[in-house]
Amino acid sequence: MVTTPQRTLLVASVSRATNDALAEAARVVDARVPAVEVRLDALEEAPDFPALRAAFGGRTLLATLRSRAEGGRFQGSTGEAAALLAAALDAGFDLVDVELARSGAGLLGLPGGRVVVSAHDLEGVPDDVEALAGRMEASGARYVKLVATARGLGDALRLLRLQSSRAGGRFTAFGMGEAGLLTRALSPCLGAALSFGAALPGEATAPGQLLASDLLDVYAVGRPRPVEALFALLGGRVSHSLSPALHNAAFEALGLPALYVPVALRSLREELPVLRGALSALGLPLGGASVTIPFKEEAARVAGAVEGSVGN
Protein backbone atom coordinates (compact mmCIF):
# COMPACT_ATOMS: atom_id res chain seq x y z
CA MET A 1 0.00 0.00 0.00
CA VAL A 2 1.12 3.56 -0.69
CA THR A 3 -0.28 6.82 0.58
CA THR A 4 -0.65 9.96 -1.47
CA PRO A 5 1.93 12.06 0.39
CA GLN A 6 0.90 15.18 2.21
CA ARG A 7 4.39 16.56 1.66
CA THR A 8 3.91 16.96 -2.11
CA LEU A 9 3.70 20.72 -2.68
CA LEU A 10 0.79 21.53 -4.98
CA VAL A 11 1.56 24.48 -7.26
CA ALA A 12 -0.96 26.44 -9.33
CA SER A 13 0.56 27.91 -12.50
CA VAL A 14 -0.55 31.39 -13.54
CA SER A 15 0.30 32.94 -16.91
CA ARG A 16 -0.93 36.44 -17.77
CA ALA A 17 0.30 39.30 -19.98
CA THR A 18 0.17 42.12 -17.40
CA ASN A 19 0.85 42.67 -13.71
CA ASP A 20 -2.76 43.75 -13.18
CA ALA A 21 -4.03 40.55 -14.79
CA LEU A 22 -1.77 38.49 -12.55
CA ALA A 23 -3.05 40.34 -9.49
CA GLU A 24 -6.61 39.65 -10.65
CA ALA A 25 -5.80 35.96 -11.00
CA ALA A 26 -4.44 35.95 -7.46
CA ARG A 27 -7.91 36.79 -6.17
CA VAL A 28 -9.53 33.74 -7.79
CA VAL A 29 -6.90 31.01 -7.42
CA ASP A 30 -8.28 28.21 -5.25
CA ALA A 31 -7.48 29.25 -1.68
CA ARG A 32 -6.63 25.66 -0.73
CA VAL A 33 -3.65 25.53 -3.11
CA PRO A 34 -0.57 26.48 -1.06
CA ALA A 35 1.81 27.58 -3.83
CA VAL A 36 1.66 29.56 -7.06
CA GLU A 37 4.01 29.62 -10.04
CA VAL A 38 4.09 33.00 -11.78
CA ARG A 39 5.08 32.57 -15.42
CA LEU A 40 7.11 35.72 -15.95
CA ASP A 41 7.86 34.72 -19.55
CA ALA A 42 4.23 35.50 -20.46
CA LEU A 43 4.44 39.08 -19.16
CA GLU A 44 4.44 41.76 -21.84
CA GLU A 45 5.68 44.42 -19.42
CA ALA A 46 8.31 44.64 -16.70
CA PRO A 47 7.30 42.57 -13.66
CA ASP A 48 6.26 44.49 -10.56
CA PHE A 49 7.68 42.00 -8.08
CA PRO A 50 6.66 43.76 -4.84
CA ALA A 51 3.08 44.14 -6.08
CA LEU A 52 2.94 40.52 -7.17
CA ARG A 53 4.33 39.33 -3.86
CA ALA A 54 1.66 41.32 -2.05
CA ALA A 55 -1.13 40.13 -4.37
CA PHE A 56 -0.48 36.46 -3.69
CA GLY A 57 -0.33 36.93 0.07
CA GLY A 58 1.31 34.24 2.15
CA ARG A 59 1.42 31.51 -0.49
CA THR A 60 4.71 29.97 -1.50
CA LEU A 61 5.59 31.90 -4.66
CA LEU A 62 7.70 30.54 -7.54
CA ALA A 63 9.01 32.78 -10.34
CA THR A 64 9.54 31.07 -13.70
CA LEU A 65 11.09 32.36 -16.93
CA ARG A 66 10.44 29.45 -19.27
CA SER A 67 12.55 29.65 -22.41
CA ARG A 68 11.14 29.13 -25.88
CA ALA A 69 13.34 26.06 -26.25
CA GLU A 70 11.59 24.45 -23.28
CA GLY A 71 8.03 25.44 -24.09
CA GLY A 72 7.82 29.05 -22.89
CA ARG A 73 8.21 32.53 -24.37
CA PHE A 74 11.36 33.97 -22.82
CA GLN A 75 14.02 34.83 -25.42
CA GLY A 76 16.37 36.96 -23.33
CA SER A 77 19.97 36.27 -22.46
CA THR A 78 21.27 34.23 -19.57
CA GLY A 79 22.32 37.44 -17.85
CA GLU A 80 18.85 38.92 -18.22
CA ALA A 81 17.31 35.76 -16.79
CA ALA A 82 19.67 35.82 -13.81
CA ALA A 83 18.90 39.47 -13.08
CA LEU A 84 15.13 39.01 -13.25
CA LEU A 85 15.13 35.93 -11.06
CA ALA A 86 17.43 37.57 -8.52
CA ALA A 87 15.07 40.55 -8.39
CA ALA A 88 12.16 38.19 -7.73
CA LEU A 89 13.99 36.66 -4.78
CA ASP A 90 14.91 40.10 -3.45
CA ALA A 91 11.23 41.08 -3.57
CA GLY A 92 10.20 38.11 -1.45
CA PHE A 93 9.48 35.33 -3.92
CA ASP A 94 10.25 32.05 -2.18
CA LEU A 95 11.59 30.09 -5.15
CA VAL A 96 12.80 30.59 -8.71
CA ASP A 97 12.90 28.13 -11.60
CA VAL A 98 16.31 27.79 -13.27
CA GLU A 99 16.67 25.69 -16.42
CA LEU A 100 19.65 23.37 -16.28
CA ALA A 101 20.35 23.87 -19.99
CA ARG A 102 20.76 27.61 -19.44
CA SER A 103 22.61 27.56 -16.14
CA GLY A 104 24.66 24.38 -16.03
CA ALA A 105 25.68 23.46 -12.50
CA GLY A 106 26.03 27.11 -11.47
CA LEU A 107 22.29 27.87 -11.09
CA LEU A 108 22.94 31.40 -12.44
CA GLY A 109 24.68 32.27 -9.17
CA LEU A 110 21.39 32.07 -7.28
CA PRO A 111 21.11 30.43 -3.84
CA GLY A 112 20.48 26.72 -4.37
CA GLY A 113 18.14 26.50 -1.41
CA ARG A 114 15.66 28.72 -3.26
CA VAL A 115 15.96 27.14 -6.71
CA VAL A 116 13.87 24.65 -8.63
CA VAL A 117 16.28 23.34 -11.26
CA SER A 118 14.31 22.19 -14.28
CA ALA A 119 14.59 20.44 -17.62
CA HIS A 120 11.81 20.10 -20.19
CA ASP A 121 12.22 17.87 -23.26
CA LEU A 122 9.49 18.66 -25.78
CA GLU A 123 10.42 15.75 -28.05
CA GLY A 124 10.19 12.86 -25.59
CA VAL A 125 11.96 11.14 -22.72
CA PRO A 126 15.71 11.40 -23.47
CA ASP A 127 17.77 8.23 -23.70
CA ASP A 128 20.06 9.49 -20.93
CA VAL A 129 17.24 10.49 -18.58
CA GLU A 130 18.86 8.79 -15.58
CA ALA A 131 22.12 10.65 -16.16
CA LEU A 132 20.21 13.89 -16.65
CA ALA A 133 18.42 13.36 -13.35
CA GLY A 134 21.76 12.77 -11.66
CA ARG A 135 23.22 16.02 -13.03
CA MET A 136 20.20 17.94 -11.85
CA GLU A 137 20.40 16.47 -8.37
CA ALA A 138 24.10 17.30 -8.20
CA SER A 139 23.36 20.99 -8.83
CA GLY A 140 22.45 21.55 -5.19
CA ALA A 141 19.02 22.99 -5.97
CA ARG A 142 16.28 22.66 -3.37
CA TYR A 143 13.98 20.97 -5.89
CA VAL A 144 14.54 19.06 -9.12
CA LYS A 145 11.85 19.10 -11.83
CA LEU A 146 12.32 16.84 -14.87
CA VAL A 147 9.56 16.93 -17.47
CA ALA A 148 9.31 15.35 -20.91
CA THR A 149 6.65 14.83 -23.52
CA ALA A 150 5.27 11.32 -23.07
CA ARG A 151 4.90 9.98 -26.60
CA GLY A 152 3.11 6.87 -25.37
CA LEU A 153 2.69 4.48 -22.48
CA GLY A 154 6.35 3.45 -22.53
CA ASP A 155 7.51 7.01 -21.91
CA ALA A 156 4.97 7.47 -19.13
CA LEU A 157 6.13 4.31 -17.37
CA ARG A 158 9.79 5.32 -17.69
CA LEU A 159 9.01 8.60 -15.94
CA LEU A 160 7.07 6.85 -13.18
CA ARG A 161 9.94 4.43 -12.59
CA LEU A 162 12.34 7.37 -12.48
CA GLN A 163 10.15 9.11 -9.92
CA SER A 164 9.83 5.97 -7.82
CA SER A 165 13.61 5.57 -7.68
CA ARG A 166 14.06 9.12 -6.39
CA ALA A 167 11.38 9.56 -3.75
CA GLY A 168 13.55 11.51 -1.31
CA GLY A 169 11.62 14.77 -1.17
CA ARG A 170 13.52 16.83 -3.78
CA PHE A 171 12.70 15.16 -7.06
CA THR A 172 9.74 15.51 -9.42
CA ALA A 173 9.26 13.79 -12.77
CA PHE A 174 6.18 13.71 -14.97
CA GLY A 175 5.12 13.75 -18.60
CA MET A 176 3.37 16.22 -20.85
CA GLY A 177 0.66 15.39 -23.36
CA GLU A 178 -2.19 12.89 -23.33
CA ALA A 179 0.00 9.94 -22.35
CA GLY A 180 1.49 12.06 -19.58
CA LEU A 181 -1.82 12.30 -17.71
CA LEU A 182 -1.05 9.04 -15.92
CA THR A 183 2.20 10.51 -14.59
CA ARG A 184 0.54 13.71 -13.37
CA ALA A 185 -1.95 11.63 -11.42
CA LEU A 186 0.53 9.11 -10.01
CA SER A 187 3.85 10.88 -9.46
CA PRO A 188 2.72 12.21 -6.03
CA CYS A 189 1.92 8.63 -4.96
CA LEU A 190 5.54 7.79 -5.79
CA GLY A 191 7.10 10.60 -3.77
CA ALA A 192 7.11 13.62 -6.09
CA ALA A 193 8.16 16.80 -4.30
CA LEU A 194 6.05 19.06 -6.50
CA SER A 195 2.86 18.83 -8.54
CA PHE A 196 1.86 21.51 -11.04
CA GLY A 197 -1.67 22.33 -12.17
CA ALA A 198 -3.41 25.13 -14.03
CA ALA A 199 -4.73 27.81 -11.71
CA LEU A 200 -7.90 28.37 -13.71
CA PRO A 201 -9.92 26.52 -16.38
CA GLY A 202 -8.64 27.08 -19.90
CA GLU A 203 -5.29 28.44 -18.71
CA ALA A 204 -3.00 25.41 -18.80
CA THR A 205 0.65 26.36 -19.19
CA ALA A 206 1.75 22.99 -20.62
CA PRO A 207 0.17 20.21 -22.72
CA GLY A 208 -1.91 17.87 -20.59
CA GLN A 209 -1.78 20.04 -17.49
CA LEU A 210 -4.67 19.35 -15.12
CA LEU A 211 -6.40 21.92 -12.97
CA ALA A 212 -4.71 22.41 -9.61
CA SER A 213 -8.10 22.06 -7.92
CA ASP A 214 -8.62 18.71 -9.68
CA LEU A 215 -5.21 17.48 -8.54
CA LEU A 216 -6.33 18.28 -5.01
CA ASP A 217 -9.91 17.03 -5.16
CA VAL A 218 -9.72 14.15 -7.65
CA TYR A 219 -6.21 12.78 -7.07
CA ALA A 220 -5.65 13.84 -3.43
CA VAL A 221 -2.39 15.64 -4.19
CA GLY A 222 -1.09 17.36 -1.08
CA ARG A 223 -3.29 15.42 1.31
CA PRO A 224 -2.82 11.90 2.69
CA ARG A 225 -4.95 9.16 1.17
CA PRO A 226 -4.16 5.42 1.31
CA VAL A 227 -4.00 3.63 -2.05
CA GLU A 228 -3.93 -0.16 -2.18
CA ALA A 229 -5.00 -0.54 -5.81
CA LEU A 230 -5.48 1.44 -8.97
CA PHE A 231 -8.40 1.44 -11.33
CA ALA A 232 -8.10 2.98 -14.75
CA LEU A 233 -9.89 4.42 -17.73
CA LEU A 234 -8.25 2.98 -20.85
CA GLY A 235 -8.72 4.77 -24.15
CA GLY A 236 -7.13 6.59 -27.02
CA ARG A 237 -8.05 9.99 -25.61
CA VAL A 238 -8.91 10.20 -21.94
CA SER A 239 -8.27 13.81 -20.95
CA HIS A 240 -11.88 15.00 -21.16
CA SER A 241 -13.49 12.11 -19.29
CA LEU A 242 -15.41 12.71 -16.07
CA SER A 243 -14.73 9.13 -14.93
CA PRO A 244 -11.75 9.93 -12.64
CA ALA A 245 -13.72 12.59 -10.78
CA LEU A 246 -16.79 10.37 -10.40
CA HIS A 247 -14.95 7.21 -9.39
CA ASN A 248 -12.52 8.87 -6.99
CA ALA A 249 -15.31 10.77 -5.26
CA ALA A 250 -17.12 7.46 -4.76
CA PHE A 251 -13.99 5.68 -3.53
CA GLU A 252 -13.33 8.41 -1.01
CA ALA A 253 -16.94 8.60 0.19
CA LEU A 254 -16.94 4.84 0.77
CA GLY A 255 -13.54 4.87 2.46
CA LEU A 256 -12.01 2.61 -0.19
CA PRO A 257 -8.19 2.77 -0.53
CA ALA A 258 -8.21 3.06 -4.32
CA LEU A 259 -7.42 5.61 -6.99
CA TYR A 260 -8.86 5.84 -10.52
CA VAL A 261 -6.53 7.23 -13.17
CA PRO A 262 -6.66 8.02 -16.92
CA VAL A 263 -4.40 5.94 -19.17
CA ALA A 264 -3.94 6.72 -22.87
CA LEU A 265 -3.09 3.63 -24.94
CA ARG A 266 -2.47 2.80 -28.58
CA SER A 267 -3.27 -0.91 -28.31
CA LEU A 268 -5.28 -2.53 -25.54
CA ARG A 269 -4.13 -6.05 -26.34
CA GLU A 270 -0.43 -5.18 -26.46
CA GLU A 271 -0.18 -2.51 -23.78
CA LEU A 272 -2.54 -3.68 -21.04
CA PRO A 273 -0.17 -6.48 -19.89
CA VAL A 274 2.72 -4.00 -19.90
CA LEU A 275 0.70 -1.54 -17.83
CA ARG A 276 -0.34 -4.17 -15.30
CA GLY A 277 3.20 -5.45 -14.83
CA ALA A 278 4.71 -1.99 -14.48
CA LEU A 279 2.13 -0.80 -11.95
CA SER A 280 2.54 -3.94 -9.85
CA ALA A 281 6.30 -3.40 -9.80
CA LEU A 282 5.67 0.13 -8.50
CA GLY A 283 3.51 -1.20 -5.67
CA LEU A 284 0.28 0.01 -7.28
CA PRO A 285 -1.49 -3.07 -8.67
CA LEU A 286 -4.22 -2.55 -11.24
CA GLY A 287 -7.47 -3.77 -9.72
CA GLY A 288 -9.67 -3.19 -12.75
CA ALA A 289 -10.40 -0.91 -15.66
CA SER A 290 -13.11 0.59 -17.77
CA VAL A 291 -12.62 1.26 -21.46
CA THR A 292 -13.61 3.95 -23.88
CA ILE A 293 -13.14 4.71 -27.57
CA PRO A 294 -11.51 3.07 -29.51
CA PHE A 295 -11.16 -0.05 -27.35
CA LYS A 296 -14.73 -1.08 -26.49
CA GLU A 297 -14.90 -3.90 -29.04
CA GLU A 298 -11.31 -4.95 -28.42
CA ALA A 299 -12.01 -5.17 -24.69
CA ALA A 300 -14.61 -7.86 -25.30
CA ARG A 301 -12.05 -9.86 -27.28
CA VAL A 302 -9.30 -9.71 -24.64
CA ALA A 303 -11.50 -10.11 -21.55
CA GLY A 304 -11.25 -13.31 -19.55
CA ALA A 305 -15.05 -13.54 -19.40
CA VAL A 306 -17.85 -11.71 -21.18
CA GLU A 307 -21.43 -11.39 -19.93
CA GLY A 308 -24.21 -12.15 -22.34
CA SER A 309 -25.40 -8.54 -22.34
CA VAL A 310 -22.17 -7.32 -23.94
CA GLY A 311 -22.80 -6.22 -27.49
CA ASN A 312 -26.54 -5.79 -27.01
Segment roles from a protein language model:
Residues 228-312:
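Phosphate/diphosphate ligand-binding glycine-rich loop within oxidoreductases
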Residues 29, 89, 137, 188, ...:
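Non-catalytic positions within long, well-ordered alpha-helices that form the structural scaffold/packing
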Residues 5-8, 226-230:
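A short, charged/proline- and glycine-enriched loop
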Residues 13-18, 120-122, 147-150, 262-270:
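Short beta->alpha junction loops
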Residues 12-15, 39, 64, 118, ...:
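Short beta-strand segments
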Residues 101-229:
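Catalytic alpha/beta core domains of metabolic enzymes, predominantly
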Residues 11-12, 36-39, 95-98, 144-148, ...:
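Short catalytic-loop micro-motif centered on adjacent basic/acidic residues
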Residues 5-127:
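Active-site beta->alpha loop and helix N-cap motifs at the rims of alpha/beta catalytic domains
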